Amino acid sequence: MKMDCFSPRSAVAVAALLALLFAGCETKKQASQPGGSQYGKATSTASEGSGEAGTGAVSTASSAKEKFGSVSFTGQVKVTGAPPAPVELDTSAKPECGKQRQAFEQGTLSAENLVVGADGGLKDCIVFISKGLKGYKAKDMVTYGHPAKVVIDQKGCQYIPHVFAVMADQEVVIKNSDPFLHNVSIPSLGFNLSMPSVGEENRARFFNRKTGSQVCQCSVHPWMNAYAYVVKNPFFSKTGGDGKFTINKLPDADGTYTVEVWHEKDRKLKAPKAQKITVKDGAVVEGNIVFEFTYKG
């Protein structure tokens, strides 16, 4: 039987063909692996800032830094003059209140409308950035160290807290910790919620119609009141018993902002003027900020 044999020239041609096929498979294998493409190295380099993609990454980081900064400033709100000491409130007309306060170990109830510390520090002021910052929403509150929800409790015939700040559209939880009737009335908003016993209610988009101060009242217990101050951004602070405050996370970029202070007794206190602060090189130029009310009697 006759058999065909390869010529040397045919063998060379077959070897060349096999080499081409093998090279093609290797190229395909590399392209299927992360970073194995012939463009993989260029893409990685760009993400590190050497190309167009890198420029985009730097820009995004810069934008985030603008919004979520690290600048903070401190200060104090003080009172000059001779403000009176807080008076004890008479709750004898509602004996259930005294019993409930004993049960909660709250002690006697004193007026909270003008509480001044030993060195003149004024409690329960809202200090806030009024100009220079825009575009913040209620969802940003947690990012800036504030609670996602504001809680108002009716406990021992007293609103707790007495003063609070809230952003428009922020969720509010209204609680009644007492086993008897209370109500939360906010005349400026046309709002009135009766709560006959222990319980709570969530109210979304509660303070969504007005900015500034809103008084909360209980018509059952007329001495009960609290104040909400509706702010436009999360850059605010409430003063403690020493009148001191801290506002955190201002943008790192250079800028100028207006700072104001609010207190419920503005009618008997000559309010201080707004102040401007300047951020430069990641710090507040003015340092510690002092607001000074004057008590008029």
Predicted segments with their positions:
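Extracytoplasmic copper-binding redox domains, predominantly the cupredoxin/blue-copper superfamily
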Residues: 25-297
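Bacterial N-terminal signal peptides that target proteins for export
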Residues: 2-13
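Bacterial N-terminal signal peptides
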Residues: 13-21
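Coiled-coil-like amphipathic alpha-helices with heptad-repeat character
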Residues: 4, 23-24
